[in-house]
């Protein structure tokens, strides 16, 4: 089942978070950054890819300073519907706390010329552990990279 880990961690009768829905239409790929006041304040970077939001928790948040490297821990995929989520996840639920949209927009691979080539290059980068992308957001803009720090681990670095 797609989004199995996401679904297993949530009690949808007790949280306002969205359930996974049907597929989505093709076009430009979206990104969203959530500011999440959970047990510890952090930011969640979510990139639309393969019909879901690939997600990383970024404890110190993204930076526009190229000299800074930010830890980014890959977490479970989220449903595409999560792109619009803001609200309070009630106490006792996974990820309880306040969630707001901090930034959103579109993103693409820096060398892609078509939508098909874009997703292909992004997927290749994700699988290789070196994902390069250009954000076109309200706050974040320019070229970024997510670089995996081990061969199969969940720890990545977010670089500008």
Model-inferred region functions:
Residues 1-160:
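A charge-rich, low-complexity, intrinsically flexible signal that marks solvent-exposed coils, linkers
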